[in-house]
Amino acid sequence: TYEEIQPFMDKIHSQHKALKKSSKMRQEFTANVSHELKTPLASISGYAELIETGMAKEGDIQHFASEIHKSANRLLSLINDIIELSQLDVMDHQLSTTNVSLNEEVVSCVDMLQMNAEKHNITIATDIIEKDCIIKANQEMIQEVIYNLCDNAIRYNKPEGHVWASVFKKDDNIILQVKDDGIGIPEDDLNRIFERFYRVDKARSKKTGGTGLGLAIVKHIAEQHEAEIQIDSTLGEGTTISIIFKTMNK
């Protein structure tokens, strides 16, 4: 009967809309990446040609080399995003786990990002780091989660802003938390920021870089580890993202 078929038709219609939406976002992503790949490549080619042909003045060579270095780093970042996108759908088959010390991984990541934070005039530090916060997880994936959360907090911050990374125990859980006092996220966007390709402020994203995949990767990895994500954000005041892991004895 119609009543019996209707739920299936509604489900198919909903899936069709989701596929169209995903396809549109993928097209926007491809167009954006194509543009962003060309920009640093053109910069590298242009500055390198000036140096190679001897047209660069001696005092300009160091500046040109610096610009080439910046553009090369931008290219590397884009390529890494594209690789991560291709890996999202195969992560399900690669979840080999071991005992991972969250406190050690957070300290290591914060140390690694110090120089990048300083370039953006941002202070990044560990806040609460409890010992023996051990989870059963894929170490590389956990490193990716911590890096993406901290990198986003640096990227979308204010001048002279702060980023704090914490690991602590609460009830029967171990919580990884990254907090910033940056620009915050509009309430209407909170439910969408973990979607693939989604970027809250496209104009700002073009300035800061990134392809809108970082938080999608975080969400996917969290789901793989049966972890819960909580986000609290106030526009103009900052954002706190918490990943709640079950303890090993649960």
Regions inferred by a protein language model and the residue ranges of each:
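Short acidic helix/loop segment immediately C-terminal to the autophosphorylated histidine
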Residues: 52-59
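Conserved glycine-rich
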Residues: 226-227
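Short beta-strand/loop element within the Bergerat-fold HATPase_c
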Residues: 160-172
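Conserved micro-motifs of the catalytic ATP-binding
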Residues: 90-95, 134-137
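Short alpha-helical segment of the dimerization/phosphotransfer core of two-component systems
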Residues: 70-76
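Short conserved segment of the HATPase_c
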Residues: 185-199
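Conserved catalytic submotifs in the C-terminal HATPase_c
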Residues: 96-101, 118, 123-133
